[in-house]
Structure formats: structure tokens, C-alpha cells
Amino acid sequence: MKMKKIIIIYLCFLGTIMANDNKKAVFAAGCFWGVESTFQQLDGVNSTTVGYTGGKVKNPSYELVCTGLTGHAEAVEVEYNPSVISFSELVDVFFKLHDPTTMNRQGPDIGTQYRSAAYFSNEDEKGIIEEKINNLNESGDFTSRVVTEVEPVENFYDAEDYHQDYYKKRGIDGCAI
């Protein structure tokens, strides 16, 4: 019986340690509903949160962000397990799910809140993003240069509850961004 308790305690402790190995990444690529849906489908992504980042106003609302006056972008915070999916792989997905050459626009959505931006937590992540941008610019895949902003992660404000898991709640697989 004592051994069972030790094993249970060990497993709980191990689960806590493993959970703490998760990392977060933040991406802005147009309307956050579709971006969130894409990242949710990846193995190694544990959770996503849609929200606002890159602006001047604390705790902005969707309505305020949509005015374009706050400087925020609609963004997705991705919590992931780096032993399953790397930051580099997340950046690859980010660049494939939107057009990184359009300034402040994705599809029919126009405004600074729909800009392309990838956020980094350290110099290694910054280097990964910049290398991928350079590779895209040299690839000839686009007729215009990549305009994705590369910025440090600062304040990320969760969007309102009705925006979280938007497509999941409605039984929609995703959208063509």
C-alpha cells in the first residue's frame, strides 16, 4: 500500500514537471479565429488563447481594437510542448496560414489589427523568425517582400470569452484566411 502511494505521488509530481516544460508563442496573422483554429489542430499544441498584443492601451476591448486606434493586433497565444513541436515548426505553420506580404490586411479583413506579426521571447526565437523571413524573401514564392513585424512578446490581453474557441464552439473546422 505504501508503494502505491509513492507511485501516485511520483506520477503527480512528474505530471507537474512535464506541464511546466510547456512554452508559449504569440502570432498575429489576421482574424484570430482562423489562426487559433489552425494552431489547435497541431500535435504538441496544448492550448490556445486569442487576444490582443502590440498596442498602447491596457486591457483593450474588441470594439476598441477594431477602431485601429489602440495599436493592437488580433493575436493567438499558443501553449505548446517543445518536445513534440518546435518553435521553428510553429513559425513555419504561421507563415503558411496567411499572406505575410500584405500590409495590415488578410483576405477581406483590413486594418492594423489584422497585421502580420511574430513575437519572440528570446534571441534564439527572434533569429528563427528572421531567418524564415529571409528564406521566404529569397525563395521567389511571393511577388512582394514579407512585411511581418518581428517584436518581443510584451503584454498579451485575452480577448472576450465569446472569441475563445470560436470555431470549435460553432462546429466549424476553420476558415480560409
Kindly give the residue locations of the regions a language model identified.
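Hydrophobic h-region of N-terminal signal peptides that target proteins for export
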Residues: 7-19
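Flexible coil/turn and secondary-structure edge motifs
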Residues: 18-177
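Positively charged n-region of N-terminal signal peptides that target proteins for export
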Residues: 1-6
